[in-house]
């Protein structure tokens, strides 16, 4: 393998392509292969900060770790961060270049295509294998002319494509067949085969369907990957962040009491992965909520980050959540705001950048004011804790108490711009002990043996092992050097 590449696409968002790429990165890295991830264009508010202060999709940061690499803007040269249904912040090579609508974006397409091509060529020259991840679905045929991340990338770089389908959602055979069938014949020619993901049960029962899929498409299924409830961390797509859903796999408490955490599912939520570390703790149950009753019933409430602070603050009020949040804080129970959630807790927000709403009243639970700056703060932090910052909002006035050098607090109300704080094991344990005491859960015992970073790394090994055991690796990875194999055209394809 020298400079070869493969594109892993998906029938839908959250089909599992990010984890398949991550698992393959880990698998190849174990074998001593120099492998790098690549996603030409990502649309996500779950981002990470590289060591040199650039911004990329969190999935590519995870894939880099799987490959034994530091996250780099080269792995995700174009990032779109939706701030509304019609506009997104455009990040190119890790830096914000402006806010664009879908129509505006088309005008940038040629320039961005050159950026993508340059970065992919550079990676192929440096690494043995580059594993590319598609975006959403390649079957968005209305976007074919401007596509940078799926078949557009595959055409320009002549990449073989494997399509991943999520059978847990139902209809996977139709998804896989239909994805190929609606493609232009030139694009169909690049689809090498399929992977079925998240299968539960006896795979022999699926075999007749896969045989028929092969007959219909002329393409093999390279593997059927079993469902694993260990693969729940580092989710990127907001479609997986569902109100009412419990995060992770709750485990029994070590003491007499558990701790119930309500994480508010904001419409423009960002960096939802901040909450995952809490869900690793025994006795801590974390749920995404939008119901005021769930806030009132919780021991701890978390307001996570958002790409639209002012708009989501208005949503909080309209949804009837502002009052129970204030009542929760007034009762002395723990309330944490992270990044945009922190900004909402302050007295005033001056926003001439994102919403351009001017001065608006915050929830007033922290005695501080926020003003949005045109230039985004991007910092990778190592002291006093590991973490990172991604925000336009700046604290312009603060009469609240300092919180461990990473934020502010008033009694049991906490606010910080730092992401990734709870991945620091000692800090998380100390905060949970304080939160349990403030919530009146005196019987809650903090575990001293939970290593979140090790858990994140372990799930990459889980995925790699699943691929090792359930994927025809010789056939799938053989595509890297061989390129797209001859495949028939489905006659219903669009010409």
Swiss-Prot record:
The keyword Secreted does not apply. It comes from the Bacteria. GO terms for molecular function: ABC-type vitamin B12 transporter activity; catalytic activity. The active site is at residues 339, 419. Keywords: Cobalamin biosynthesis, Glutamine amidotransferase. One of its GO terms (biological process) is cobalamin biosynthetic process. Residues 258-427 form the GATase cobBQ-type domain. Pathway: Cofactor biosynthesis; adenosylcobalamin biosynthesis. It holds the Pfam family GATase_3. InterPro entries: Class_I_gatase-like, CobQ/CobB/MinD/ParA_Nub-bd_dom, CobQ_GATase1, CobQ_N, CobQ_synth, GATase_3, P-loop_NTPase. SUPFAM superfamilies: Class I glutamine amidotransferase-like, P-loop containing nucleoside triphosphate hydrolases. Catalyzes amidations at positions B, D, E, and G on adenosylcobyrinic A,C-diamide. NH(2) groups are provided by glutamine, and one molecule of ATP is hydrogenolyzed for each amidation. Belongs to the CobB/CobQ family. CobQ subfamily. This is Cobyric acid synthase. It comes from Mycobacterium sp. (strain KMS).
């Amino acid at each position: 393998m020298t400079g070869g590449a493969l594109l892993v696409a998906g029938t839908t968002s959250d089909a599992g392509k990010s984890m398949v790429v991550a698992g393959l990165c880990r698998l190849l890295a174990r074998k001593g292969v120099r492998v790098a991830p690549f996603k030409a264009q990502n649309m996500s508010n779950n981002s990470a900060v590289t060591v040199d202060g650039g911004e990329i999709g969190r999935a590519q940061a995870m894939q880099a770790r799987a490959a034994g690499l530091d996250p780099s803007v080269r792995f995700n040269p174009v990032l779109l961060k939706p701030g509304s249904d019609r506009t997104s912040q455009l990040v190119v090579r890790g830096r914000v270049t402006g806010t664009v609508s879908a129509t505006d974006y088309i005008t940038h397409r040629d320039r961005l295509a050159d950026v993508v091509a340059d970065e992919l060529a550079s990676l192929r020259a440096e690494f043995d294998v580059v594993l590319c991840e598609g975006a959403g679905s390649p079957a968005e045929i209305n976007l074919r002319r401007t596509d940078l991340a799926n078949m557009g990338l595959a055409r320009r770089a002549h990449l073989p494509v494997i399509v991943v389908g999520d059978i847990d959602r139902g209809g996977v055979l139709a998804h896989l067949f239909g994805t190929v069938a609606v493609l232009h014949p030139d694009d169909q020619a690049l689809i090498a085969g399929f992977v079925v993901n998240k299968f539960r049960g006896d795979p022999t029962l699926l075999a007749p369907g896969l045989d028929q899929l092969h007959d219909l498409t002329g393409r093999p299924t390279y593997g059927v990957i079993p469902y694993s409830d260990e693969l729940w961390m580092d989710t990127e797509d907001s479609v997986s962040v569902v109100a009412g859903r419990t995060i992770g796999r709750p485990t029994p408490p070590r003491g007499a009491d558990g701790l119930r955490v309500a994480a508010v599912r904001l419409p423009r939520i960002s960096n939802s992965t901040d909450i995952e570390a809490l869900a690793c703790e025994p006795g801590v149950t974390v749920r995404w909520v939008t119901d005021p009753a769930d806030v009132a019933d919780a021991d701890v409430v978390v307001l996570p980050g958002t790409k639209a602070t002012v708009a989501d603050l208005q949503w909080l009020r309209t949804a009837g959540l502002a009052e129970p949040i204030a009542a929760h804080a007034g009762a002395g129970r723990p309330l944490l705001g992270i990044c945009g959630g922190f900004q909402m807790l302050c007295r005033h927000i001056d926003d001439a950048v994102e919403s351009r709403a001017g001065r608006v009243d915050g929830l007033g639970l922290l005695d501080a004011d926020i003003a949005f700056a045109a230039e985004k703060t991007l910092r990778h932090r190592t002291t006093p804790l590991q973490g990172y910052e991604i925000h336009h909002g700046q604290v312009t006035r603060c009469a609240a108490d300092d919180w461990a050098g990473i934020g502010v607090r008033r009694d049991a109300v906490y606010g910080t711009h730092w992401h990734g704080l709870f991945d620091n094991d000692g800090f998380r344990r100390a905060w949970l002990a304080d939160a349990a005491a403030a919530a009146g859960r005196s019987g809650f015992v903090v575990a001293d043996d939970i290593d979140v970073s090790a858990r994140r790394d372990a799930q990459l090994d889980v995925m790699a092992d699943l691929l090792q055991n359930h994927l025809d690796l010789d056939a799938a990875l053989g595509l890297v050097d061989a390129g797209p194999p001859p495949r028939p055209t489905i006659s219903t394809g669009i010409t």
